[in-house]
Regions:
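Short solvent-exposed beta->alpha transition segments
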Residues: 304-319
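A short, surface-exposed beta-strand/turn
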Residues: 106, 342-357
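Structural preference for beta-rich elements and adjacent junctions enriched in aromatics
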Residues: 22-301, 317-333, 343-345
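Short beta-strand segments that buttress and anchor functional surface loops
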Residues: 335-338
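Bacterial Sec-dependent N-terminal signal peptides
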Residues: 1-26
Length: 357
């Protein structure tokens, strides 16, 4: 356990250094509607229920930075009922392999599929789930993104009612043939995803912030077994990261960039509409200021006290000019703005937590 905590600290430092060194690009999150099913979904990796046939596939996954087309295709479908959030992933892979069998081990050392969920969209207290082709699970509860200090990561936290199953279209761990890929079927219990005790944790006709990621490694065969490929110096080659909704940087832990999954109360096969609320677009701009503050702090070891020191004193949303307020205090700052769309005050704290009043 101590070694795993040290590893997570190393990951945190690495992400903190690299994500702000990368060139930022504007990210427009994707949306998808998850329709309700009244059919019993058997989690067996086969997805042969009528509801799955009616559900729509997502777009093809894209490289995490948004620039490159992945070598192999990945797609997801989604459903929900009164108890579970269902996810179906098809993962094209000519060589299906895996060797990690211990729960809560570092699953992304194998090729894997990952689910990130932030039910209330405040970028804090979110969930990460990683599963490999052996159906080995790593689930975490993350109190704050790695970019923040004092961010306990609850690696011992587990989904209590999670169901998952894998089917392989080909063979597993056989380097002598070519496979088509693997299919992963997941049922995440809503009871494990409470945003607060006083809230109904079943998201009827509302959205959650969600993203999906696929880690894919180049491989080599050693003594007839797959392993991650190494360079001439014996170092592992970098992995590929392919995602549903692009992050713009090699960092899944910027939850404000995740996609929007709308849980429609209409049954699968019916039609519903969802558009991203205008207040969410204001949030995007506030997070741009937040990231600018991060960059400013790295350079001057203090936060900016005026918006003009960052990216300007106003923002434009839907042809409306908004004037955010930057308030400094002993431990950092608050960014706030009055939404002309909802008449709510939108607040972003120095640790990235979003509040709406």
């Amino acid at each position: 356990m101590i070694l795993k905590k040290v590893f997570l600290l190393v990951v945190f430092i690495s992400i903190l250094i690299t994500s702000y060194a990368q060139t930022k690009k504007d990210v427009v999150p994707l949306t998808q509607i998850a329709y309700k099913t009244t059919e019993t979904i058997i989690i067996d990796g086969k997805a042969d229920e009528t509801s799955w046939e009616k559900a729509s596939w997502s777009n093809d996954f894209i490289d995490i930075e948004g620039f490159k087309t992945p070598n192999h295709q990945t797609n997801v479908k989604m459903l929900w009922d009164e108890n579970y959030y269902y996810i179906l992933a098809t993962i094209e892979e000519p060589h299906v392999w895996g060797d990690i069998k211990e729960r809560d081990a570092v699953i992304f050392y194998n090729n894997d599929f990952e689910v990130f969920i932030d039910p209330d969209g405040d970028t804090h207290n979110y969930y990460e789930l990683e599963i490999n082709a052996l159906n080995t699970i790593w689930d975490l509860f993350i109190t704050k993104p790695y970019r923040e200090l004092n961010n306990p990561i609850l690696n011992d936290w587990n989904y209590t009612g999670l169901k998952s199953a894998v089917t392989v279209n080909g063979t597993l761990n056989n380097p002598n043939d070519i496979d088509k890929g693997w299919t992963l079927e997941i049922a995440i219990p809503f009871k494990d995803l409470r945003t607060a005790y006083e809230q109904d944790n079943i998201p009827r006709d509302t959205f959650w912030r969600v993203n999906f990621s696929r880690v894919n490694w180049q491989y080599q065969i050693t003594d007839g077994k797959y392993e991650r490929k190494k360079d001439a110096e014996g170092q592992f080659l970098e992995e590929y990261n392919w995602v549903w909704s692009t992050q713009g940087v090699i960092n899944m832990h910027e939850p404000e960039k995740w996609g929007y999954v709308y849980f429609s109360s209409k049954n699968v096969g019916e039609k519903d509409n969802f558009s991203i609320p205008k207040d969410e677009k204001i949030k995007w701009k506030l997070y741009e200021l937040y990231r600018a503050q991060k960059t400013y702090f790295e350079k001057y070891n203090t936060y900016a006290t005026t918006l003009d020191s960052l990216t300007g004193s106003s923002i434009i949303i839907e042809n409306k000019k908004l004037n955010p307020i930057l308030e400094s205090h002993k431990t950092g700052y608050n960014l706030s703005v009055l939404s002309p769309f909802s008449n709510k005050i939108l607040i972003l704290k120095e640790d990235g937590k979003f509040i709406s009043k």
